[in-house]
A protein has these predicted regions:
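Extracytosolic ligand-binding ectodomains
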Residues: 1-348
Length: 348
C-alpha cells in the first residue's frame, strides 16, 4: 500500500439491494491492494459505500439518491449497481456527471460513454448458450417463463432469436411478476402442451415460486435457467428446489486465477460475486495506475488502457480489460453451465 500523506483516491460503492456482510467490499479491496503492492499507486484507495433499495423491490429514486450522495462525496469512480434495471438508471447519471462507473449486472445495454460493465451473466449471451444446450440434450420443444421486467423481457427476446436460429420450437410462453410467490397457475397453463423442457428467464426471486409450483404439480420436466439461479449462493434454503436444473454461472473449476483466489480468500472464490468483486478491484487498481491525471476523466481513460488481465470468472483463458469503444470487461468463455446437486453448485 502507499505510505505517503497524499489524499486517498475515493471510490464509491453503490449497492442497489441490502448487503449480507462485507464480502464484496473486502474482495474488491483485495484486488486494488494487489495492484498497490506492485508499487504503481502513489496513494491509498478509500471505499465510500452507499446503500439503496433499487428495483425491483425498491425504486428509481433510491438509486438516484445514492448516486447523488456519492457524487457529492467527490468519488472519482463508482462500482455498481448490480441489477440491470438499476444500471440502466445509473448509466445516464454517470454520463451527465462525467463519473466513470463499473456495474456488475447482466445487461450489455447498461454500457455508455462513462459506464463500464463487468458481466455477471449476460441477458444477451446466455440465451444462445441455453438454446445450444437444448440441442445438445435432444430437447426440441420449450415452454418459456420469463420475468415481466426489463431483465426478463430482454432474456426472452434473445432466447426467441436463439431458438429460431437453431430450429427449436416454443410450445408456450408466460410472464411472471419479478417478486411473484406463486407460479402454479402459470405452469398449469404451460404443461398441457407437453414441452420437452421448461426454460426460466428472470432476475431470480420468482425462480423460487417456479420451483415450488413444479413440486406442487408433480411436474418432473427438465429445467434450463439463466444466471438467476446464482441466487442459490445467497439462499441455501432454495437449493433443493433447484435440484437437477441446469443454469448459467460465471465460475468454473478449471480457472487458475480463481484457484489462486481460493487459496487467499476462499469465501470470495466460492461464488460469482466474490470473483467479480476481486476482478473489479484489479481493474480499478490498474485503471488508477494507468491514469495520467487523477480526475474522473483521467480514471475513465485509465480504465480504457487496461488490457489482457486473466479473469477470475469464466473458464480458464477468460480475460478482462476495456477499450475506447469496448466497455465490456470479460472476453472469452465466461459463461459456465452448472447445476445444483445435493446443496452444491456443480459444473456440468
Amino acid at each position: 500500500m502507499a505510505t505517503t500523506t497524499a489524499l486517498p483516491v475515493r471510490i464509491g460503492l453503490l449497492y442497489d439491494f441490502p448487503q449480507m456482510g462485507d464480502l464484496f467490499a473486502k474482495a474488491l479491496q483485495m484486488g486494488v491492494d494487489d495492484v498497490a503492492q506492485t508499487g504503481r499507486l502513489d496513494r491509498d484507495v478509500e471505499l465510500v459505500e452507499r446503500q439503496s433499495r433499487g428495483l425491483p423491490s425498491g425504486s428509481e429514486a433510491e438509486v438516484k439518491r445514492a448516486f447523488a450522495e456519492l457524487d457529492a462525496e467527490d468519488v472519482v469512480a463508482i462500482v455498481g449497481p448490480s441489477i440491470s434495471d438499476n444500471a440502466l438508471i445509473a448509466a445516464p447519471l454517470c454520463d451527465a456527471a462525467r463519473i466513470p462507473a463499473i456495474n456488475y449486472s447482466g445487461g450489455e445495454r447498461t454500457r455508455s460513454q462513462w459506464m463500464f460493465h463487468y458481466q455477471v451473466g449476460s441477458l444477451e449471451e446466455e440465451p444462445p448458450v441455453l438454446a445450444a444446450r437444448m440441442v445438445e440434450r435432444g430437447l426440441r420443444r420449450a415452454a418459456v417463463i420469463f420475468d415481466q421486467s426489463p431483465v426478463g423481457r430482454r432474456y426472452a427476446e434473445c432466447f426467441e432469436a436463439a431458438r429460431a436460429r437453431l430450429g427449436l420450437e416454443v410450445t408456450g410462453t408466460a410472464s411472471i411478476a419479478s417478486l411473484a410467490e406463486d407460479a402454479t397457475e402459470l405452469l398449469g397453463r404451460l404443461r398441457p402442451a407437453e414441452p420437452d423442457v421448461l426454460v426460466y428467464l428472470g432476475l431470480g426471486v420468482s425462480s423460487r415460486a417456479v420451483a415450488l409450483a413444479l413440486a406442487a404439480l408433480g411436474w418432473n420436466v427438465p429445467v434450463l435457467a439463466n444466471s438467476a439461479l446464482m441466487f442459490g449462493y445467497a439462499r441455501p434454503d432454495w437449493r433443493d428446489g433447484y435440484a437437477g436444473w441446469e443454469y448459467i454461472d460465471t465460475i468454473a473449476d478449471d480457472n487458475r486465477s480463481r484457484a489462486h483466489l481460493q487459496e487467499r480468500f476462499p469465501h470470495a472464490a466460492g461464488g460469482p460475486i466474490g470473483c467479480a468483486a476481486y476482478d473489479i478491484g484489479r481493474l480499478l487498481g490498474e485503471g488508477i495506475a494507468a491514469a495520467e491525471h487523477l480526475t474522473r476523466a483521467g480514471i475513465a481513460d485509465g480504465l480504457r488502457r487496461v488490457k489482457q488481465l486473466p479473469a477470475s470468472s469464466g473458464h480458464e483463458g477468460t480475460l478482462i480489460g476495456f477499450g475506447v469503444w469496448d466497455h465490456a470487461a470479460l472476453k472469452g468463455h465466461y459463461l459456465v453451465l452448472r447445476t445444483w446437486r445435493d446443496g452444491h453448485s456443480v459444473q456440468v
